[in-house]
Amino acid sequence: MKIDSATFYKSCSELKGLPVSSLPEIVFVGRSNVGKSTLLNTLTGRKALAKTSSTPGKTQLINYFTINDRLYFVDLPGYGYAKVAKGQRYEWGRLLGGYISEREEISLVVLLIDSRHPDMESDQQMIEFLEYYQRPYGIVLTKYDKLKQKEKSRVRKALKSFSLKTKFIVNYSALSGEGKESLLEQLENYTG
């Protein structure tokens, strides 16, 4: 998949504000601060397309980006961040859960997992949620360049054991660009 154009389309704080469109949606989900916005920026070649922050919980809305005028990339709020009010966590969970379970336009969910922490319970719960709702999903291991070779092997084994239905697993480094072409090739299969 070659990305020729990528533009911000809209942000939604509620499900009723989602775009009325038949364009396929490729959704990016993961724990807070896993690198969703950074990945979107490196995939599209636009440094400031999605706002990034070192502060977990920066993305608080469902953010839509139009890609090549033929599909959306959707950046969801991160899950698992404890330093926000309980009510805010509940609202994020309701928004994220409602979107994934109800949105017909979703063609693929890309689950980002921090390769340094591949066995987090919240990531396992997300995989179970995606499988329950029969959503096709792939896994992107972020921050992969920070692992030693021995750790890389352990991470891939761990993931294969609890994500049997994943369409793909891609190692990704925003710094080196490792995994970018592989991920774009995978995404091409879900563009409609």
Curated annotation (Swiss-Prot):
GO cellular component, one term: cytosol
Domain EngB-type G: residue ranges: 22-192
Record SUPFAM superfamilies: P-loop containing nucleoside triphosphate hydrolases
Assigned keywords, A-Z: Cell cycle, Cell division, GTP-binding, Magnesium, Metal-binding, Nucleotide-binding, Septation
GO molecular function: GTP binding; metal ion binding
Matching InterPro entries: G_ENGB_dom, GTP-bd, GTP-bd_ribosome_bio_YsxC, P-loop_NTPase, Small_GTP-bd
Residues that, per the record, bind GTP: 30-37, 57-61, 75-78, 142-145, 172-174
Taxonomic superkingdom: Bacteria
GO BP annotation list: division septum assembly
Cofactor: Mg(2+)
Coiled coil: none
Residue numbers binding Mg(2+): S37, T59
Functional summary from the UniProt entry: Necessary for normal cell division and for the maintenance of normal septation.
NCBIfam families named in the record: GTPase_YsxC (TIGR03598), small_GTP (TIGR00231)
Family that this chain belongs to: Belongs to the TRAFAC class TrmE-Era-EngA-EngB-Septin-like GTPase superfamily. EngB GTPase family.
Matches recorded under PANTHER family: ENGB-TYPE G DOMAIN-CONTAINING PROTEIN, MSS1/TRME-RELATED GTP-BINDING PROTEIN
Official protein name in the record: Probable GTP-binding protein EngB
Name of the gene this protein is made from: engB
